Amino acid sequence: MNIKNFLNNRLWKNNSSLVQLLGLCPVLAMTTNAINAIGLGMTTTLVLTITNTIISSFRKIIPKDLRIPIYMMIISSVVTSIEMLLHAYTFNLYQSLGIFIPLIVTNCIIVGRADLIAYKSSIVESFFDGIFIGLGSMFAMFAVGSIREILGNGTLFFGANKIISNIHSSVFFTLLDKKFTIILAVFPPGGFLILGFLIAIKNFIDLYYKKNTIKNIEQCSCSNKIK
């Protein structure tokens, strides 16, 4: 397994949020600030990793015709367990994420990776696939959430105590004066526009890199012909 290609495919080239556009409902609804984005991203990554590992472990005994209902049972069990842990140990984050924790069960990313990778691959590959697909989605959520929080509220990492309980609620960065904030950014249309902007930036970077690669190949070919 080529590690570089493995990471590039999951974190950048086939990013589940910026390329495949899966699970957009929680991405747009819960990324009103950076902390919510991190919380939801970490939860989704944990669910992906655990479910991928479990499904891969039992892939040889899961009947092909019944695999989807079995996926859903495993995913819902894992999500319920994690929801109970969040309720017990990070109650503020649990309250903030609300209904979007149980809705992780229906997230297309998790079901898709279970069927595409976990059901057909080794436990180790499935485990790392879950981690890096989740991290790729979390990075996209964090980027959207950070931009929305800065533009909409002028702050960054407001409410960090939701994730790290021993941090005081007043610990955050103020980057923009309230009179310069754009309230649209914290609403779903603003999130949609910011997500589209990030997708456009990614596509521009990919296109620029592709053109440079082609240009370098052509220059090398010309140099070889001259020689």
Curated annotation (Swiss-Prot):
Enzyme class: translocase
Entry's EC annotation: 7.-.-.-
Matching Pfam families: Rnf-Nqr
Intracellular or extracellular location(s): Cell inner membrane
GO biological process assignments: electron transport chain
NCBIfam families for the chain: PRK12405.1, rnfE
Known role: Part of a membrane-bound complex that couples electron transfer with translocation of ions across the membrane.
Protein name: Ion-translocating oxidoreductase complex subunit E
Gene name linked to the record: rnfE
